[in-house]
């Protein structure tokens, strides 16, 4: 298993400087990670730095709360792609979902997917704020949307992905939707277990330590 190609090497801290982003990019090139996941303000810079590599540029939309107007999220997506983003990780409107406004949530995801075109869309549902039943329901919604991935977490709530989150998503989605586990993956065994349970992508800020841990196994 080439775990490096499952990794979205992530730095979304608001205080991240260009020096921090360059370090992230250099690490991603060295380890040949799937992507760097960064704030929209750094897309152009990352795209230029990664021009001669296979590492993709992933960014976030409606992040981290998800409560922007749909039109704002769509416009954010348009600008992100124009600046060179290869993959989009959007946050659903969590309050609307918990209010059982399922059609609103579905239509918003569809609108952003339409703007993405052939670019990969991952839908962040913030499992820390959902019951197990809600995780199953939101997985069903994402399956109907045309998005490629469902993603567990922003990394900005009180916890990241749990093994149970991924188990529920996999049970509902089976092979009809890819799963990104993000946040809370701290050691190599966490990464291994997430993949065994069905995760197809791992969003991690501790990617280097985890890769070093995996190399020892």
Swiss-Prot record:
It comes from the Bacteria. One of its GO terms (molecular function) is deoxyribose-phosphate aldolase activity. One of its GO terms (cellular component) is cytoplasm. It is an enzyme of class 4 (lyase). CDD domains: DeoC (cd00959). The keyword Transmembrane helix does not apply. Keywords: Cytoplasm, Lyase, Schiff base. It holds the Pfam family DeoC. The keyword Lyase applies. The active site is at residues 89, 151, 180. It is found in: Cytoplasm. Its EC number is 4.1.2.4. One of its GO terms (biological process) is 2-deoxyribose 1-phosphate catabolic process. Gene3D superfamilies: Aldolase class I. Pathway: Carbohydrate degradation; 2-deoxy-D-ribose 1-phosphate degradation; D-glyceraldehyde 3-phosphate and acetaldehyde from 2-deoxy-alpha-D-ribose 1-phosphate: step 2/2. Catalyzes a reversible aldol reaction between acetaldehyde and D-glyceraldehyde 3-phosphate to generate 2-deoxy-D-ribose 5-phosphate. Belongs to the DeoC/FbaB aldolase family. DeoC type 1 subfamily. HAMAP family: DeoC_type1. This is Deoxyribose-phosphate aldolase.
